[in-house]
């Protein structure tokens, strides 16, 4: 019996900058701020699950020292995106003098979800309290942040983690939790995580909760996604000009494996890209197919019937057979 003790993403969150997985182009620069006991306003941008929040917390611990909790404020812009958040929580925190530290740090996560008005209010607070506080802003898309804020920050672009980096971390957690696992199961987790370590750890914990040895099958039991080999076979079948056979494969995948339309389109894109990288789909054909995938992905997300749209997508693939 596997005994769960809270979310593993928190249990195994690195506490020091040196322990952060990946981001070798960023960590040395952050460590210099620790050495200097000084830092400008920072912006961490990049996809989910790549270490932005972990880096902010580790930096705060190391640069603020013993009293880091008293001098650190964390807010999530997705929970409260209005101007009130900026004018109350941030303003009240910034007005207080640092306690046993050179300055205070405000970490605002998912700041790209703030309204433009809230961002302009934030910019004014950043200007007002430069002597006593520094900001760390985290976002997925820096393009959604107004220029006056970007110009006031040192920008760090976090990259998706590589497969071997994720596997190494999963192996570490599995050892600590005394898990039995197949090596191929971890590779399957990496496939579905797509560079997102948080997603990978959550998948590992979900599979472990089944209380058995972690196998490729147990990963599919918790992930609710199609098996890559089935999607790849369907793509090859339609590109061979066999529409009815490919359509039957599509229906079987969606019905028997319970795959949503959006997930199906995503996996078709992933497997087609892998086929192109392996040289099984030439460049010109790949361009046309990707254009079709983008069109039908949009239609499904706008509410069109997924089954009909996916069969229509196969028909478009037939044009490139």
Curated annotation (Swiss-Prot):
Residues that bind ATP: 46-53
GO molecular function, one term: DNA binding
GO cellular component: DNA replication factor C complex
InterPro entries attached to this UniProt entry: AAA+_ATPase, ATPase_AAA_core, DNA_pol3_clamp-load_cplx_C, DNA_Rep/Repair_Clamp_Loader, P-loop_NTPase, Rep_factor-C_ssu_arc, Rep_factorC_C, RFC_lid
One Gene Ontology biological process: DNA repair
Transmembrane segments: none
Keywords: ATP-binding, DNA replication, Nucleotide-binding
NCBIfam families, per database record: PRK00440.1
Subunit structure: Heterohexamer composed of four small subunits (RfcS) and two large subunits (RfcL).
Function field: Part of the RFC clamp loader complex which loads the PCNA sliding clamp onto DNA. The complex possesses DNA-dependent ATPase activity which is further stimulated by PCNA. In conjunction with PCNA stimulates DNA synthesis by PolB, relieving inhibition by replication protein A (RPA).
Family of this protein: Belongs to the activator 1 small subunits family. RfcS subfamily.
UniProt-recorded name of the protein: Replication factor C small subunit
Organism, as annotated: Methanothermobacter thermautotrophicus (strain ATCC 29096 / DSM 1053 / JCM 10044 / NBRC 100330 / Delta H) (Methanobacterium thermoautotrophicum)
Lineage, uppermost ranks: Archaea, Methanobacteriati, Methanobacteriota, Methanomada group, Methanobacteria
